[in-house]
Design a protein with these regions (language model features):
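Flexible, surface-exposed loop/gating regions in the mature catalytic domains
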Residues: 133, 147, 151, 322, ...
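Catalytic Cys-His active-site segments of thiol-dependent hydrolases/isopeptidases
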Residues: 384-389
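Short glycine-rich loop/turn motifs
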Residues: 149, 153-156, 339-342, 371-373, ...
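Carbohydrate-active enzyme catalytic cores, enriched for enzymes
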Residues: 138-141, 165, 208, 212-383, ...
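CBM-like, beta-strand-rich accessory domains located in the C-terminal region of large
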Residues: 390-676
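Aromatic-lined, polymer-binding surfaces characteristic
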Residues: 5-9, 13, 17-248
Length: 676
């Protein structure tokens, strides 16, 4: 709008970074002026609106007049489908560029030129896009089949183009209004049972498709909403409730660090992808949340391919004044996105803190076969990482990156989730439950049984983060006897030392210490430790497909059908830290556990062997070390040199009572998850 152009021109007078960015934009525009580059119509348009130099407008007009001579903007492969897909993402992008160019150069065109270009753009883009995705009787797509990022991109960019053409083509006004009325339905899509489609938006905010595609789909919708508001002054655009929760969602799935902002790369995303584009558009829509300013301030210019950066037209126009961005956001340190199965827990919002991210939800399309997988960011590095992804046509995508083998999960007889789930989806999804955060104690439960129910009847993974250790407890049961293995994707130097594995990357370092069902074999002479875990090094492609990297599998030699796994991930303050927690394996009647000693504190952790579903009507009472409880798992902490009976800090997982002698420490008729 003229107002936004005027605002940025005023800001340039006292913001050197904007002046520098404008220099880059003008240079790109001048190159496009010589080449008559359609793909730089946004640069040419901005250059004209800022400088009022008619050369840019004339170039835009020339480019558009040539563009509408094309027979089709369709894609050959898409057009060969039955029925033909007349529109796709490439057309959507062309629609946006055409809309920007047509609107910018409108006043230098004759009425006949306007009409010719408008009719051509309607034929090439508006009618195919809105016709395929929205309008009767030509619509071929539904929200159930293609209601993810493609829907908003194709229909909303087609809608923006229609908005720019409505002076010459009054008939498209009705199409625009139909789109405006339909847009909230995209946000509200509730999923379906018959085709195993996920609900698009979580009640806590955000979209299940991965950060990359969530941001893209939302960005495209917001661009149309802004364009509609700009062309309908004084009219109420209506409410889309999901928008209010997006700043929290984008922030909760990011990891602030020294250098570029990282984000969770579950599914088809990369850790350098960020959501500044959607955040800027939300801010422009009037959502003046300080969290948005904080988020945008974390993003490094140019850190990913499609961003709204200062030296690109949209970033130049929509980056707000960040001088009042808070140092840290006022957000909780944990977040459960239960509808699509993500959780994050962090020890602070400072840069280079520690964050644990867990996923157990739907599998389909951009959502990988990664039920119960996790990522650990520590001291600026995803020290335990996701395997990543690559370009979809490459065989490595379907054969590795999408599959369970590329994630930190448990396999049974070498199998994870069935490969067919990439196309057909997981009929039974994974879940996350019972997120607790009490500062130095955090917990979440992952249930990945459904996606691997062809082999498993129980696939539960508990994450209990106490002080500087994340305890990962696996409760596994299969339909038949076989072999279990634990996969680890690490990002750093991997060194086995006795029963521990040390992983280090710069200032970031963790120790991986398997404790149950067995320790890691103490040496390479694994034949001397026939019952202990042995390890396998597996080569896999790197994300850039330029080489290979190694991930690791810890194998249990025994053939069984029920296992309790317990692995400690020790978060080291420095790679050279020697004062690590001492962990003693302990067992008693119907329980296993640990005694952990560190820095004058003792923590006893107990896992109830009767509480894993093996009892039907009898309750799961155990009496470890003088305690009496039916809890699935519990922990008590107390100062070294004092008695456990005097403990004040308790974690109770799925328990109705905790007693000792004649004293009741906790009681509830129903089993609860409690930190007290």
């Amino acid at each position: 709008t003229p107002q936004r152009i005027q605002q940025v021109k005023q800001r340039m007078q006292h913001e050197p970074k904007l002046q520098e960015a404008w220099g880059d934009i003008k240079k790109t525009a001048d190159e496009a002026l010589q080449k008559k580059d359609f793909n730089r119509l946004d640069y040419l348009s901005l250059a004209y609106l800022v400088t009022d130099n008619k050369e840019y407008a004339d170039a835009i007009k020339e480019i558009l007049l040539k563009a509408v001579e094309a027979e089709s903007w369709g894609d050959v492969e898409m057009m060969a489908r039955i029925p033909a897909w007349r529109s796709q993402l490439g057309m959507a992008h062309k629609s946006f560029l055409s809309a920007v160019g047509y609107d910018a150069a409108y006043n230098v065109m004759s009425s006949s030129e306007r009409k010719k270009i408008a009719e051509g753009l309607k034929r090439l883009a508006v009618e195919p896009a809105l016709g395929d995705w929205l309008l009767e009787p030509t619509r071929i797509h539904s929200l159930n089949s293609m209601g993810h990022n493609w829907w908003t991109s194709c229909v909303c960019q087609g809608g923006i183009l229609a908005l720019s053409l409505q002076n010459e083509l009054p008939e498209v006004k009705e199409w625009v209004e139909q789109l405006h009325e339909s847009l909230p339905e995209w946000f509200d899509f509730a999923g379906d049972v018959l085709q195993q489609k996920a609900k698009s938006f979580d009640e806590a905010g955000g979209m299940y498709e991965s950060l990359n595609y969530a941001n893209f789909g939302i960005q495209e919708a917001l661009l149309f909403r802004i364009a509609w508001i700009n062309t309908h002054p004084g009219q109420n655009p209506g409410d889309i409730p999901q928008l209010a929760k997006l700043p929290s969602y984008f922030s909760q799935v990011c990891y602030p660090r020294t250098g570029m902002l990282h984000s969770l790369n579950f599914g088809d995303s990369h850790k350098n992808v960020s959501a500044e584009s959607s955040m800027m558009l939300l801010y422009a829509l009037g959502m003046k949340d300080p969290t948005i300013l904080w988020y945008i301030a974390q993003v490094e210019q140019g850190q990913h391919r499609d961003g709204f950066f200062l030296n690109r037209p949209m970033g130049f126009l929509y980056t707000p004044d960040l001088s009042k961005a808070p140092a840290v956001p006022q957000l909780p340190t944990s977040q459960l996105l239960a509808d699509f199965g993500w959780a994050t827990m962090r020890d602070s919002w400072e840069k280079d803190a520690t964050m644990l991210a867990v996923k157990s939800g739907h599998t389909w399309n951009h959502s990988h076969a990664d039920a119960n997988s996790f990522i650990v960011f520590h001291k600026g590095v995803d020290i335990i990482k996701d395997g990543g992804n690559c370009w979809y046509p490459n065989p490595a995508y379907r054969n590795y990156f999408f599959q369970s083998q590329a994630h930190n999960v448990v396999l049974f007889n070498g199998e994870g989730q069935p490969r067919e789930q990439q196309y057909s989806g997981s009929t039974l999804r994974g879940y996350l439950h019972h997120l607790l955060d009490a500062g130095n104690v955090k917990y979440v439960l992952a249930n990945g049984t459904g996606p691997v129910s062809n082999n498993f009847s129980r696939n539960f993974r508990h994450f209990l983060w106490m002080d500087n250790v994340i305890y990962m407890i696996d409760d596994l049961k299969t339909h038949k006897i076989g072999q279990f293995e634990w996969l680890w994707h690490t990002n750093g130097t991997y060194k086995k030392s006795g029963v521990d594995v040390n992983v280090a990357n710069g200032n970031s370092s963790v120790v991986i210490r398997p404790l149950y069902p067995r320790l890691l074999a103490k040496s390479d002479f694994v034949h001397d430790y026939p019952e202990d875990l042995y390890w396998e090094e597996i080569e896999a492609p790197t994300e850039d497909l330029k080489g290979t990297e190694t991930y690791y599998s810890f194998h249990l030699p025994a053939e069984v059908n029920r296992v309790k796994g317990l692995t400690a991930i020790i978060l080291k303050e420095t790679p050279n830290e020697k004062d690590l927690p001492q962990m003693e394996r302990r067992e008693g009647q119907d329980w296993i556990g640990l005694r952990i000693r560190h820095k004058g504190k003792v923590t006893d952790l107990y896992i109830n062997q009767l509480a894993d579903g093996r009892l039907m009507h009898s309750n799961s009472w155990i009496m470890p070390d003088g305690w009496m409880t039916d809890a699935y798992m519990f922990a008590v902490s107390y100062p070294e040199g004092t008695e456990a009976a005097d403990a004040k800090d308790f974690f109770i997982c799925h328990g109705s009572a905790l007693r000792r002698d004649k004293e009741t420490y906790f009681s509830s008729l129903s089993k609860l998850f409690v930190i007290q």
